[in-house]
Amino acid sequence: MINQSFQETNRFSMNSRLQWLIVIACITMVFAACSKTDTYKSDQLSEYMPLQKGKYWIYLLDSTNFYNSQRVQTQYQLKDVVDDTLKDNLNRTTYRVIRYIRPSSSTSDSAWNIMGEYYLIPTTQTLETIDFFNFKYQSLKLPVVLNLTWKGNSYLPAFPYSEALPVQSSYNFTVDGGMGDWDYTYTGVGENDTINGIAYTNVVTVSQEDASTNLLPDNQTPTSVNDFATRAYSAEKYAKNIGLIYKKLELWEHQPASPTNPGGYYVGFGIQLQLIDHN
């Protein structure tokens, strides 16, 4: 009886030790998995946005504006010139970029008129952009790898274009709500692309938003004049050793038909930039 009891106790003890060994092994595996650091081979952000005083980019700008039910498109040329470097309030090197505008058909340097200025701030992990309205974006982020996602608009106010701007510059819509939650994603890395007939290599695509409400598959036409419809689209492309080569932003609403506007009406804007020259 004593031997049998001893054997059962010993067997129980061995089973308990085995269970604890399994638990400890599992915990060790979990901690090992948690402590593992993935490493990515990535280009530097400076390769996709080379910045130095005197650097310039010239773009073809297609601008869309709405007048009641009419969609009006106009075309210009923009020239962005890195004008100077300064320090921001965090003592970070900041590049001031002056933007000029002229008619799309012009080739005269005297036709350029200053439109405004914006700022580019390269940090150790991101490229920050502060635009004409003092809105800040994280335009690029390390590592530059496919499907990396980040909240590039996280610094924006809740309704940047409808509430944060001065009344004379604001839009009476709500489609800008939630822009701070947009997911910037690298949907293309190291690709070939053609913009306005010019071929580029090593192109990075940053998809920012692509959302529609009550639109036909063309994403431009409401399903009915009686429907409230929205369009929010944003994307950028950068070419290695060149910079921004393409940008598109659509932000607009269609309001349903009414006695005063039987076709409904639109509120909002759209822009498209395509690089045509640079140094």
Which residues does each predicted region cover?
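Bacterial N-terminal signal peptides that target proteins for export
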Residues: 3-22
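Conserved functional acidic sites
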Residues: 35-279
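C-terminal motif of bacterial Sec signal peptides marking the signal peptidase cleavage site
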Residues: 30-33
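Alpha-helical transmembrane segments
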Residues: 25-28
